[in-house]
Amino acid sequence: MAEFIKPYNDDPFVGNLSTPVSTSSFSKGLLGNLPAYRRGLSPLLRGLEIGMAHGYFLIGPFDKLGPLRGTDVALLAGFLSSVGLIIILTTCLSMYGNVSFTRSDSKDPLQTAEGWGQFTAGFLVGAVGGSGFAYLLLANIPVLQTAGLSLFS
């Protein structure tokens, strides 16, 4: 097993280990296709794609595990709760961008205040849209609403 796990780039002072999982071409390809690392995406599209994914999966826990679970308004309460959390997250992203990016001479547009503002705006629109899409799916397709009940009851 020791021959499979080595210091990253044979430098023991880096602090990372090179394992078959972390240095495989499959792992690098999978991580390279995530919107955070994909080349050529504008900050707005990057935020939109990340926001859609987060908005889509945030509604489920609020719907199935929230205080109004099992009632007729659980799905609506879950949707509104997820939108509330999205607004809080967007506010935090905006505050982070305002204090972190004061220079505008970076090569990466996401590392500037304007680029981070575009990312934040894309995140807000994408997350609310993803949450709304999940709400519409759950409200209009009954088999999706009851699919996860066996996990929590």
Curated annotation (Swiss-Prot):
One of its GO terms (cellular component) is chloroplast thylakoid membrane. Residues 1-72, 140-153 are stromal. It is found in: Plastid, Chloroplast thylakoid membrane. It is a multi-pass membrane protein. It holds the Pfam family PsaL. Coiled coil: none annotated. GO terms for biological process: photosynthesis. The chain crosses the membrane at residues 73-93, 119-139. Keywords: Chloroplast, Membrane, Photosynthesis, Photosystem I, Plastid, Thylakoid, Transmembrane, Transmembrane helix. Residues 94-118 are lumenal. Belongs to the PsaL family. HAMAP family: PSI_PsaL. This is Photosystem I reaction center subunit XI. The gene is psaL.
